[in-house]
A protein has these predicted regions:
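Glycan-recognition and catalytic cores of secretory/periplasmic carbohydrate-active enzymes
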Residues: 1-407
């Protein structure tokens, strides 16, 4: 990777880390085990389904997986196989595009285009428009989401990836895919009235909504598309979703995972998802209501979702037993959020620097990849592209990109 002049010592270390990571990725490959590997195969799916039906019997059924997750993470290989994750490919595409923009190296853009080509092949096969989900059956408390079902928490990342690459290298085919993604987001994904001004987005084309970050994702995608495509009709679809997110904020500034009376936990990366989307929307429309909500959110975030060492805490209100102290995914999303909002909220700058320094000091393995989790005892060192090798790669590339702009 070419050097960048006049950047901070921290950015120089990040550049070296990114160089080493891209070398590791080339050797390791583009499929990996996953956070859900314990429960993606037939044994894990049956155990998890039983847990949701009968807590007593289900707890006994999932106990071996939870034990392995806490003490022997490499046991994932006993339950499933490495898979390709579209959400990871989207993050890799964005990360390599950031590197191209920072380094002006055509090879990075070629790599980004490569991951877009992978996304074209892994779209949900049963839908007319471009959309993406998981390549495994996902057992949830509300039933099984079958492999190939579009997820509004995945498709927006593909939208961002295609849009970012298009802005670096315009291509008519990519624009058509962007337009297709937008049609899917506006029509296949549904919304449901929650107040006179608000509507909640569905998570898939088949559910009744309620998950806060789902509405945030949909609103941002449609707002961004409205500007890119010059289609103000998309704003009318997005606005009620924005209102739902704003109305879902708790009095203390936090956001629950869902407004369904059940999943009211507050965790790190879902909080980041909501605030990231609001931050991007605010930069598009300057809505003062959003800035006010973000101010309350940032205050809660900094006071409740960090450990004493300055690294992210998984939960401020946990829904269940937590078998780890810190997660790579939380760190990656923290970096993204701080980069998006540090100008509006300068107090995030020190958080940004602390988390990046912590990652570089303790989370980078000798082979160039990242540790996945700091467990109660030891580390989960299994590389998982969705959880969150790709997200950390993108967030550090985003940081380097921003540093080169300042330089």
């Amino acid at each position: 990777m070419a050097s960048v002049k006049n950047i901070s010592p921290l950015a120089e270390k990040v550049a070296v880390t990114l160089t080493n990571f891209t070398g590791w990725l080339e050797k390791y490959g583009e499929v990996s085990w996953d956070h859900q590997s314990f429960f993606a195969g037939p044994v894990g799916r049956r155990a998890k389904a039983l847990y949701y039906k009968n807590k007593l019997l289900g707890t006994a059924a999932v106990a071996p997986m939870i034990f392995f997750e806490a003490f022997l993470p490499s046991a994932r290989r006993l339950f499933h196989h490495p898979i390709r994750l579209p959400i990871a490919d989207a993050h890799f595409a964005m990360g390599f595009t950031f590197l191209h923009e920072a380094m002006a190296n055509p090879a990075h853009l070629q790599k980004a285009v490569h991951f877009l080509a992978a996304l074209e092949k892994t779209r949900c096969p049963d839908y007319l428009e471009f959309c993406w989900g998981y390549p495994f059956d996902w057992v949830t408390r509300n039933g099984v989401i079958k492999a190939g079902t579009p997820l509004i928490t995945t498709t927006p990342y593909a939208f961002e990836a295609f849009l970012q690459v298009y802005k670096s290298q315009a291509d008519a085919g990519r624009k058509k895919i962007i337009e297709s993604i937008v049609r899917h987001t506006g029509t296949d994904i549904k919304d449901f009235k929650t107040s006179e001004t608000a509507r909640t987005s569905s998570y898939t084309p088949h559910d009744q909504g309620g998950v806060v970050n789902a509405s945030a994702y949909r609103a941002f995608t449609l707002m961004s598309a409205a500007k890119f495509l010059g289609d103000n009709a998309l704003l009318k679809i997005a606005e009620p979703n924005i209102n739902f997110v704003l109305e879902s904020q708790n009095a203390d500034g936090s956001w629950p995972y869902a407004k369904d009376g059940v999943r009211d936990f507050v965790d790190h990366f879902h909080t980041c998802f909501v605030m990231k989307a609001l931050a991007k929307i605010y930069k598009l429309n300057g809505d003062p209501r959003i800035l006010a909500a973000l101010a309350k959110g940032v205050d809660y975030y900094l006071k409740n979702l960090f450990a004493e060492n300055g690294m992210p805490r998984p939960f401020s209100k946990a829904p269940r037993l937590t078998v780890y102290q810190c997660e790579l995914y939380d760190c990656a999303e923290c970096i993204n959020l701080c980069l998006l909002l540090r100008r509006e909220f300068p107090q995030l700058q020190s958080t940004l620097e602390t988390v990046i320094a912590g990652i570089l000091k303790n989370w980078v393995k000798r082979d160039g990849s990242f540790r996945s989790r700091k467990l109660m005892f030891g580390w989960d060192n299994v590389p998982m592209h969705r959880w969150a090798q790709s997200q950390m790669f993108r967030s550090l590339a985003f940081f380097l990109h921003e540093e080169t702009l300042q330089a």
